[in-house]
Each structure stands twice: as structure tokens, then as C-alpha cells.
Design a protein with these regions (language model features):
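Transmembrane alpha-helices of multi-pass small-molecule transport proteins
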Residues: 10-21, 27-77, 127-130, 184-207, ...
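Hydrophobic/aromatic residues within transmembrane alpha-helices
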Residues: 25, 36, 85, 111-113, ...
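Structural motif at transmembrane-helix junctions in multi-pass transporters
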Residues: 28-35, 81-97, 176-182, 234-257
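Alpha-helical transmembrane segments of compact multi-pass small-molecule transporters, enriched
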Residues: 43-47, 97-111, 123-126, 189-194, ...
């Protein structure tokens, strides 16, 4: 198996763990979304600053730098949508709804880069998209008829998936002009820019500061929304550079499987660490 395939599969595993910890921080610890998003952007901005101060890319067109920065901008809005839904819904429902991105990537990569997928690859893409549609279906609340109900709010995640797909295509377009480390670092600056503009308010900063001073809580967010995302993006950027972006995106469709499996395992082994409730219908979906 080629190394880029392993990297493409390792990425959703890393971010599945991140997702479950995010749910714990948001729902378990009750961290407000503005403070949470500030840390998400700020932590990546810190990593970016360290890398770029020590090794800034030279001889690169300004347009390429802007494109790398725009990757973070697009992904920032994707994350804002996802975190907002994650605070309200279970991870095993939110993450599949994000997996419409492979179909966008596959179609656009075919148009832009001339990439093509085999029938089996297209099957993998459609399974990912089908899972996202099922995740937007829920059972009527108590006192209702118990019918399956479509939740329009999940369309917000579909929009986020389109933005994520666009960012992956930009990554593919500039991979020959910048190193993997530089792309991920400049992406971090773009992420920080949006999060700071939208959420940098005195109350949010104070709440974040108080949270980071709590030794029992701070490590969760430092590792899960600091160290792990930076390394996760190194993995997927490397994979995009070495393999077809459409296939890399399709392999990222394994994330819902990892989230579901880790959630089920956590519910069994460490129920206090998992903030999700399984029902028979959701298990079937």
C-alpha cells in the first residue's frame, strides 16, 4: 500500500478523535462556542507563526501565498458551521453530513485536473454521500407520530462540505509551489484571520483564558484542537500532493465510520467520556 493512502486514511482517524473530544469540551465542559472557535483559530495561528518565522517560503508568487491563506479561510467557515451543529447534535450524525465533499471534489477534480475515478471509487463516493443524507433524517420527538423527519439545518453542513471541497482543490493546485508544511502553516493564518474577526470579543477572550487555566480541562482542548489538527492537516496535504485529490477525499469518507466505531467503543468502555446517545433507529441509519 502506498504511503499517501495510509496518510489519507490516518487523517480521518485523527479527526474522529478530535471530533469526540470537541463534543466533550462543548457539551461536557460547556465551553462557549466563541471561546472555542477562538482557540481553534488561535492555536493554528501559533503553529503557523512558529513555522513561518523560522522558515518562510522564498521565491513564491504572492498569488500562491494568498491561495494557501484562502484554504484556511474556507475551512474556517466549514468549522464554524460544524461546531455550531456539533453543540446541538451527536457527532455520529454531524460528521456523516459533512461527507458530501467527496462528490464535489470528484466532479470538480475531473473538470479542473482531468482526474477520473473507477466504478469502485465512485461507489465509495456515493456511499459517503448516502450516509450524509441518512444523517439528516431523525425520528420525530416524543409525543409525535415517530415518523422520520428531514432536518433542513443539516443543509448547512452540506454548504460547509462544499467549502471544504474547494479548499482541497486549491491545495492540489498549489502543491507544486509550496511544501506541505508551508501550505498547512499559511492555512493556519487564514483560519486564525476568520476566527479572530468573528469571535475576538472581550468576553470570549476572558472565558478562553479561564478555561486554559484549568489543569483538568485545558489539556483536552490543547491536544485535540491544537496539536492533532495541525498534524492531521499535514497528513491530508501530503496525501493530496501524492495521489488523486478525488480519491484522497473519498478515503476521507471513512471518518464517519471511525466516529461511530470510537463512539460505540467509548460508550461501552468509558461512557463518561462520550456525550452521545444511541437509539435503535440511529444505529440502523
Amino acid at each position: 500500500m502506498e504511503l499517501w493512502i495510509l496518510a489519507a486514511l490516518a487523517n480521518p482517524l485523527v479527526f474522529s478523535i478530535v471530533t469526540l473530544v470537541d463534543k466533550k469540551v462543548l457539551s461536557g465542559f460547556g465551553m462557549p462556542l466563541p471561546s472555542f472557535n477562538l482557540w481553534v483559530g488561535g492555536s493554528q495561528g501559533i503553529f503557523a507563526t512558529i513555522v513561518l518565522l523560522n522558515n518562510f517560503p522564498s521565491g513564491v508568487d504572492f498569488v500562491v501565498l494568498v491561495q494557501a491563506w484562502s484554504i484556511g479561510v474556507l475551512q474556517a467557515f466549514t468549522l464554524i458551521f460544524m461546531f455550531w451543529m456539533l453543540k446541538r447534535e451527536d457527532p455520529s450524525r454531524v460528521i456523516p453530513a459533512m461527507q458530501t465533499s467527496p462528490i464535489y471534489v470528484a466532479l470538480l477534480a475531473w473538470l479542473i485536473f482531468g482526474e477520473s475515478l473507477s466504478a469502485w471509487h465512485w461507489l465509495a463516493v456515493m456511499l459517503a454521500v448516502g450516509g450524509s443524507i441518512l444523517s439528516s433524517v431523525t425520528v420525530g420527538s416524543a409525543g409525535s407520530t415517530g415518523r422520520l423527519v428531514f432536518q433542513p439545518l443539516f443543509l448547512l453542513l452540506a454548504l460547509g462540505a462544499l467549502l471544504m471541497a474547494s479548499s482541497q482543490l486549491i491545495t492540489k493546485a498549489i502543491i507544486d509551489d509550496l511544501s506541505t508544511l508551508h501550505i498547512v502553516s499559511i492555512r493556519g493564518l487564514g483560519l486564525f484571520t476568520v476566527m479572530a474577526i468573528v469571535f475576538a470579543r472581550p468576553d470570549a477572550l476572558r472565558t478562553l483564558g479561564k478555561f486554559l487555566k484549568q489543569p483538568k480541562k485545558a489539556p483536552w482542548i490543547i491536544v485535540a484542537e491544537g496539536v492533532m489538527p495541525f498534524n492531521g492537516h499535514l497528513l491530508i496535504t501530503y496525501a493530496i500532493g501524492k495521489g488523486p485529490v478525488a480519491l484522497v477525499s473519498a478515503l476521507g469518507g471513512a471518518r464517519p465510520i471511525f466516529v461511530f466505531s470510537l463512539t460505540a467503543l467509548g460508550t461501552w468502555l468509558a461512557p463518561k467520556l462520550v456525550f452521545e446517545k444511541f437509539t435503535r433507529v440511529s444505529m440502523l441509519l
